[in-house]
Amino acid sequence: MRIFLCLIATTLSLFLKGEWPQFRGPSGNGHANGTGLPLKWDEDTNIKWKTAIHGKGWSSPVIWGKQIWLTTATVDGKKLSVLCLDRDTGRVLLDKKLFEVAEPQ
């Protein structure tokens, strides 16, 4: 799941111009206006960059300007963090723990 989120965010950021502010895209309907989208990708094909993240992906990526924002959580759900990645390079710009709970619900 960790690499998957980064791969999806990377693939989207390569071909989409503009922002991706919410789950399922700009209009919330799963449609994107990009052109030349790849029909195939894997670990090495049509991937611009990869960035390992800690925990597991906990949200849809948000793409805004030159940044990709996402949240991660530990497997036990006790810690939630927010990450900001550089859209062009995948470099981590911010990695901040948002909160920690003793007993997740």
Segments (PLM) and residue ranges:
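Sec-dependent signal peptide recognition
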Residues: 1-8
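Hydrophobic h-region of N-terminal signal peptides that target proteins for export
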Residues: 8-17
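Noncatalytic, solvent-exposed loop/strand surfaces
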Residues: 16-105
